[in-house]
Every structure is written in structure tokens, then in C-alpha cells.
């Protein structure tokens, strides 16, 4: 579990905190989404989860290890994998398998274990056939898959995705979400997805909304997403399916506003045919 207690963070020479009095437990086997408009503190929180930043006040503990403990920081960063929006910033080699092997090599693992981890990680993201390719010639979605594989080769318990799909086309987003679902369900990886896009958050177990550096609400997609007024007040764009339901309801066919899935929407409409 990642335990956050009374967390406040100030950037150097800033008078106002980027995060203020955050307390949150990220549970085992959880798919957690952190939402918020730009400047709400989401990316700052991501960097605090694995010790890239250290709290100004309060504490962050990863499986009982305090991120402020210099003796534990390497173990914490192995446990908490962090993925950013631009994969080019995390790809460093001229060959896919070399890039994925970089992390395990730095752990001092033997050659056989490194090979096993590289193969397993590429298989998890369905990129085995690209192991000898140059990352520069891959699509944005494929590059992000390789970045995920590189993180997963470190065998993290937690995967933090900081706007990791924001620069990817719709097809690439679907492919990466499939990989993330697989990691969560089959590998037991705790997923912490930081985004402003509700479409990426529909499968979350819980949703945390940040506003001006504070936790505004903790809810579930089923509770929060149908409320267009609440979402707009939080600076979040409602799901496209919510717009469709609202338009249909204006035509006199009264559909449930709780529907979040297009297949369920079609099924509901068929009841009126």
C-alpha cells in the first residue's frame, strides 16, 4: 500500500503550495485514477509517489518505506514505476530490446534473468515482434508500449501513468489501455493513472479529484461521471456518452443518466424500439 499522510509540497521560491494536506491510501490490487484540471497538482503528486520529489510537510510511505529515507529510495523507485506523457523522454537506446533491458541491467541481474524479463515485458504489451526494431521508427503508441515494457521489466508493484496517453492517437490509446488492463488483472500491478480525460478513467475502482492542490472528492466512476453539473464545476469535461444521452432525453426518450458504456446504451435504446 502507498500511504500519504498530511502531504504538503511547495516548489522552491513559491509562496503557495502545489499540494496541501493530502491524505490518501492507495490500496493493493487497485486501479486508481487521479483527475483534475491543469495546475491542480496531479503531476506533482505523481513525482512524490516514487521519491522524485520529497514532501515539504507530511509523508509518503511505499509498503512501509518512507520516501524521505535516502537508504530506501532505490527500493522505492523499483516498486513504483513512473511513466510520463512523452515516451521519447524515456527511450534511450537504438534498439527496442536494449531499451527494455536497461533497467534490469542496472539492477545487476544476470544475463538469463535480464533476457527473461525483456521477453516477458514485451509479450505483456504485445511488442515481441519489434524487439530488434529502432524506437525512432515506431508510432507514438508503440513507443509508449516500449516505455511501459521498460518500466515493467523492473518488476514494479505500482505503475504511475502521468498523462501517459495524452500524446497518443485514439487507436494507440485503445492498445495501451488493453496492455494496462492486462498488467492490472493478470500481473496484479496497482495502476495509478493521472489524467484529465474521463474516457481513460471509466474502468477505475476509485477516482480522486484534485483542485488547487487539495483533494476535492473521492468517488467511483459510477457515482461521479453521470453528474454533468458536478464534473463541469470541477473543470472536467463530461463523457461523450453523457452528451449523447442528454440529447436523446431532450427528444423525449428518457434514458438513465447512469449509463457509462456504449453497449449498455444501445441495449437501453432497444427497449424503446
Swiss-Prot record:
PROSITE patterns: ABC_TRANSPORTER_1, ABC_TRANSPORTER_2, CBIO. It is a peripheral membrane protein. One of its GO terms (cellular component) is ATP-binding cassette (ABC) transporter complex. ATP binds at residues 36-43. PANTHER family: ENERGY-COUPLING FACTOR TRANSPORTER ATP-BINDING PROTEIN ECFA1, HEAVY METAL TRANSPORTER. ATP-binding (A) component of a common energy-coupling factor (ECF) ABC-transporter complex. Unlike classic ABC transporters this ECF transporter provides the energy necessary to transport a number of different substrates. This is Energy-coupling factor transporter ATP-binding protein EcfA. It comes from Syntrophomonas wolfei subsp. wolfei (strain DSM 2245B / Goettingen).
Amino acid at each position: 500500500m502507498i500511504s500519504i499522510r498530511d502531504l504538503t509540497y511547495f516548489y522552491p521560491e513559491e509562496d503557495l503550495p502545489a499540494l496541501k494536506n493530502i491524505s490518501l491510501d492507495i490500496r493493493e490490487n487497485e486501479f486508481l485514477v487521479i483527475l483534475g484540471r491543469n495546475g491542480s497538482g496531479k503531476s506533482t503528486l505523481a513525482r512524490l509517489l516514487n521519491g522524485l520529489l520529497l514532501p515539504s510537510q507530511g509523508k509518503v510511505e511505499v509498503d512501509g518505506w518512507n520516501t524521505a529515507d535516502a537508504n530506501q529510495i532505490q527500493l522505492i523507485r523499483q516498486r513504483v514505476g513512473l511513466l510520463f506523457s512523452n515516451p521519447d523522454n524515456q527511450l534511450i537506446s537504438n534498439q527496442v530490446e536494449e531499451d527494455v533491458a536497461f533497467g534490469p541491467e542496472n539492477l545487476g541481474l544476470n544475463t538469463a534473468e535480464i533476457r527473461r524479463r525483456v521477453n516477458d515485458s514485451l509479450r505483456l504489451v504485445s511488442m515481441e515482434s519489434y524487439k530488434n526494431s529502432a524506437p525512432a521508427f515506431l508510432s507514438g503508441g508503440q513507443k509508449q508500449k516500449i516505455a511501459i515494457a521498460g518500466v515493467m521489466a523492473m518488476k514494479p508493484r505500482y505503475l504511475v501513468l502521468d498523462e501517459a496517453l495524452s500524446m497518443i492517437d485514439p487507436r494507440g490509446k485503445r492498445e495501451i489501455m488493453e496492455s494496462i488492463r492486462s498488467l492490472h488483472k493478470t500481473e496484479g500491478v496497482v495502476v495509478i493513472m493521472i489524467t484529465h480525460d474521463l474516457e481513460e478513467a471509466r474502468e477505475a475502482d476509485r477516482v480522486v479529484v484534485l483542485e488547487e492542490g487539495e483533494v476535492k472528492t473521492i468517488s467511483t466512476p459510477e457515482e461521479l461521471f453521470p453528474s454533468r453539473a458536478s464534473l463541469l464545476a470541477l473543470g472536467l469535461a463530461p463523457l461523450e456518452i453523457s452528451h449523447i444521452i442528454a440529447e436523446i432525453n431532450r427528444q423525449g426518450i428518457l434514458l438513465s443518466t447512469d449509463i457509462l458504456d456504449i453497449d449498455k446504451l444501445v441495449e437501453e435504446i432497444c427497449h424503446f424500439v
